[in-house]
């Protein structure tokens, strides 16, 4: 089905003007501005539950693990409508942490099965009411995916004029902020055993896309206005990752950081020129890099991975500033907040480390499983577990839990924060938590 407006009714300019709200900061893409997971807003909520402190709970048109973004007065979410048939993929495997004997992970495939639709929905950030909806049929080869997610894993991104939504089969669409299609591309077929997880990134009008797949990996930049190719860089064979490229400001110019298996790479975001790299035996990283106070931090691989700290500005092969062995997170990206690093993992442990050395400041077992990346603001750190517990910690060199809030849903997507409110995306539902709207 082609794109359309909610309820089949075109949104009027009067309604659109009424939706505008001044003073709320956008959360325009994966982990917000700069992919940092940070907000400068104050008065963020501390305590809530399914019956208290929840501004709205809205059903989505489908399921997915992409995170919500906030653009103006819109909260925008992508979904897959329709389900994969759950059959083993080509290489089912037991992924096991020797300390915890973690449960088996499975890739699933759907060569047949029912028709799927890829959906982009926009909701009012005040009340959660649907403003518009765009749908397109999922075409081409259906790739294998991890059983925890589907084709709606990449988080959309917006430049304030357009929304770019990318899906795990390679389909990409640019929409205006009224839900009308501007251009569309199909970059498939995709081939990545656990499914595509990288989100699009923006740089000075360019849309940057990482396709670290077998048999060949590449990095691609498109003109945001038209979808035309600006540059493409082949990254070789056998490189697989699920991380999102992150732009950092280096002493010799901007750099695009790609956390991938085999090594970390830095590119010139305007041209795709490879600037520097650092080798590693770690495989298939999911977390994205984070850049703060002139240093790049990243978790380097699968379970029990290393943490690296690196400085931008190098050329050729470089070495990390420091490494912390076996302390990294499996899926969530690192949070750097007020001079400390925060990391969560799939066995319910949160670790706080010193930014200068990587030395552990404190470690606390909260329980649960963490796949969502942490966010922070207003002196607080927010950690969302898969089973719907949001732990609110006081930021600092001592572990202090301010609240444990439960919503009774399954959460794999990372939160978005805007206007004093936290937006949480469950499997098929969107929550707005907190009452402040600015």
Report residues per predicted region.
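Noncatalytic, solvent-exposed loop/strand surfaces
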Residues: 23-438
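Generic alpha-helical secondary structure signal
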Residues: 8-9, 20, 427
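N-terminal secretory signal peptides that target proteins for export/translocation
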Residues: 1-9
């Amino acid at each position: 089905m082609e794109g359309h407006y909610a309820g089949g009714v075109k949104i009027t300019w009067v309604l659109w003007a009424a939706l505008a709200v001044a003073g709320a900061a956008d959360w325009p893409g994966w982990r917000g501005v700069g992919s940092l997971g940070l907000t400068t807003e104050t008065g963020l909520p501390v305590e809530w539950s399914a019956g208290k402190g929840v501004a709205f709970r809205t059903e989505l048109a489908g399921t997915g693990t992409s995170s919500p973004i906030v653009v103006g007065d819109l909260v925008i979410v992508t979904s897959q409508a329709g389900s994969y048939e759950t059959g083993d993929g080509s290489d089912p495997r037991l992924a096991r942490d020797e300390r915890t004997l973690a449960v088996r992970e499975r890739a699933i495939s759907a060569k047949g099965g029912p028709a799927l639709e890829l959906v982009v929905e926009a909701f009012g950030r005040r009340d959660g009411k649907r403003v518009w909806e765009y749908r397109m049929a999922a075409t081409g080869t259906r790739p294998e995916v991890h059983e925890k997610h589907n084709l709606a894993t990449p988080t959309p991104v917006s430049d304030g004029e357009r929304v770019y939504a990318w899906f795990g089969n390679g389909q990409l669409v640019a929409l205006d902020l009224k839900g009308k299609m501007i251009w569309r591309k199909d970059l498939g077929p995709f081939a990545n055993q656990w499914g595509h997880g990288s989100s699009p990134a923006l740089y000075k009008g360019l849309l940057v896309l990482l396709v670290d797949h077998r048999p060949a990996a590449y990095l691609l930049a498109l003109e945001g206005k038209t979808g035309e190719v600006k540059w493409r860089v082949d990254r070789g064979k056998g490189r697989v990752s699920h991380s999102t490229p992150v732009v950092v400001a280096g002493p010799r110019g901007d750099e695009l950081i790609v956390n991938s298996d085999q090594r970390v790479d830095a590119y010139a975001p305007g041209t795709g020129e490879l600037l520097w790299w650092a080798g590693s035996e770690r495989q298939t990283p999911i977390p994205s890099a984070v850049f703060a106070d002139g240093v790049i931090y990243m978790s380097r691989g699968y379970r029990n991975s290393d943490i690296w700290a690196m400085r931008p500005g190098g050329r050729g092969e470089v070495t990390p500033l420091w490494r912390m062995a076996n302390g990294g997170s499996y899926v969530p990206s690192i949070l750097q907040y007020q001079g400390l690093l925060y990391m969560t993992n799939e066995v319910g442990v949160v670790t706080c480390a010193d930014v200068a050395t990587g030395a552990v400041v404190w470690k606390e077992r909260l329980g649960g499983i963490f796949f969502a990346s942490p966010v922070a603001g207003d002196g607080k750190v927010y950690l969302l577990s898969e089973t719907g517990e949001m732990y609110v910690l006081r930021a600092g060199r001592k572990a202090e839990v301010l609240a444990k809030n439960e919503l009774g849903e399954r959460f794999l997507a990372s939160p978005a924060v805007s206007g004093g409110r936290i937006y949480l995306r469950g499997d098929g539902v969107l929550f707005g938590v907190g009452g402040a709207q600015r």
